[in-house]
Regions:
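FIC/Doc superfamily catalytic core
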Residues: 1-181
């Protein structure tokens, strides 16, 4: 790891300590912050996949159950399902449940609930391309093994006490590279 990376990770640790020193935050303030972040995360995640709901519309769909005129049922379900998946991930973290291929598939199934029953929670069975990228994800027959290796490497990184930011970067990069769904 290069020196710049070490400096940045130390800065992250200092900022985390500063944030921790402010705790406990009032419960109501913490909930408002978390709710706002969840909506923004849902909006951005769905937007990059082609969902046309605005940030405000996403908040209305998720928080108020409002149906937005001119938007498809799929777009509404994508917002609702993504929020449910975030909630599930938080539950996994609180209960200290081990991340596995099964939990990853369960998260995927939540995201596609009511949208694509056939593929929800299942690795893809067809080759894919990522628009605007030169990267070609692995062929479907390679996914199972690559996901097994992905989980094994993740567990090894945890065991080695690798910095959480580096673990998160690895997880994100590998899921994008493998593109299992």
């Amino acid at each position: 790891m290069n020196e710049n990376m070490n400096v940045m990770l130390k800065e992250v640790d200092v900022l985390k300590e500063q944030l921790s020193a402010l705790r406990p935050l009032p419960e109501e303030a913490l909930k408002k912050i978390q709710d706002a972040l969840d909506i923004e995360y849902t909006y951005e995640s769905n937007r990059i996949e082609g969902n046309t709901l605005t940030l405000q519309e996403t908040a209305l769909v998720v928080n108020e159950g409002v149906t937005i005129s001119g938007k498809s049922m799929r777009e509404h379900l994508e917002a609702i399902n993504h929020t449910e998946a975030i909630s599930y991930i938080k539950d996994i973290a609180k209960q200290d449940i081990e991340i596995s291929e099964r939990t990853i598939k369960e998260i995927h199934a939540l995201i596609l609930h009511g949208i694509d029953r056939e593929n929800a929670g299942r690795y893809r069975t067809v080759p894919v391309m990522i628009l605007g990228s030169t990267h070609m994800p692995p062929q479907p027959y390679l996914i199972e093994k690559q996901m097994e290796d992905f989980i094994l490497r993740f567990k090894q990184m945890e065991k080695e006490k690798v910095h959480p930011v580096l673990i998160a970067a690895y997880l994100h990069d590998e899921l994008v590279r493998i593109h299992p769904f």
